[in-house]
Regions:
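Compositionally biased terminal segments of proteins
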Residues: 1-194
Length: 194
C-alpha cells in the first residue's frame, strides 16, 4: 500500500468528518510513521468523536466509494466502539474508533496536529501526538495481554526517536490509564533512564 493510496482512502473520510463537524485524528501505525517510526500497514486507525445523529449523513457521503456498514456504524456510535470502512478503489481498510469521551481521549484530540502524509506531502491530516500515540499503544498492549511485539516495538521506537518527548504528560496519563509500569519498561527498552 502506497502513501498515495492511503491519502486517497483517507481524504474523503476526513472531509466528511470535517463537513459534519466531527473531531478526528489518526492513530496507530500511521501516527507512528508520522513521528519517525515507519511501519507498513494495510489499514489506518482513525479516532472520531462521532455522534449517532451524524451516522446516516456520514454514510450517505461515503456511499459508493466505500463499503459502509450503516448498522455497525450506529452501534459503534452508541456504544463507543469501532467499525470498519473499506475504500473500494484501493481496498484500503479504515478502522474508525469512536472516542470514548474520557479525559485522556479529549486531551489526545486537542493535542492532535496536522501532518503531511507521503513523500510529496500529499494530504495534511490531524495525527495524534507522539505521546498520545505511545499512551494509546500502551493501553492496547495491556488489553491484548502484553503479547504484541509489533505494538511494543512501536512504543519503544517512538520513545527512542522522541528527543522532545513531554515526560510529565506521559507520566500523568500513564498513571491515570494504569500503564505506568509498562511505560517504565518501555523507557528502559528504549535506552533511557526512568
Amino acid at each position: 500500500m502506497t502513501a498515495t493510496d492511503l491519502v486517497a482512502a483517507l481524504r474523503p473520510v476526513v472531509e466528511a468528518f470535517d463537513s459534519l463537524g466531527v473531531q478526528y485524528f489518526l492513530g496507530g501505525s500511521v501516527a507512528s510513521s508520522a513521528h519517525g517510526v515507519a511501519r507498513a500497514s494495510l489499514d489506518a486507525d482513525v479516532v472520531a468523536d462521532l455522534d449517532a445523529s451524524k451516522v446516516d449523513r456520514l454514510a450517505r457521503q461515503l456511499a459508493g466509494a466505500y463499503y459502509v456498514p450503516v448498522e455497525q456504524m450506529h452501534t459503534a456510535a452508541v456504544d463507543r466502539r469501532s467499525f470498519n470502512l473499506i475504500h473500494l478503489a484501493t481496498m484500503f481498510k479504515i478502522d474508525v474508533f469512536v472516542s470514548k469521551g474520557r479525559p485522556f481521549d479529549r486531551s489526545a484530540a486537542d493535542r492532535a496536529r496536522r501532518h503531511a502524509i507521503g513523500e510529496l506531502g500529499d494530504g495534511a491530516f490531524f495525527v495524534a501526538s507522539a505521546e498520545d500515540t505511545v499512551l494509546a499503544k500502551l493501553e492496547w498492549f495491556r488489553l491484548g495481554g502484553e503479547t504484541s511485539e509489533r505494538q511494543w516495538w512501536d512504543i519503544v521506537g517512538l520513545l527512542r526517536v522522541g528527543a522532545d518527548t513531554d515526560r510529565p504528560y506521559l507520566r500523568h496519563w500513564a498513571e491515570t490509564l494504569g500503564v505506568n509500569d509498562l511505560l517504565d519498561r518501555a523507557w528502559i527498552d528504549a535506552g533511557h533512564q526512568i
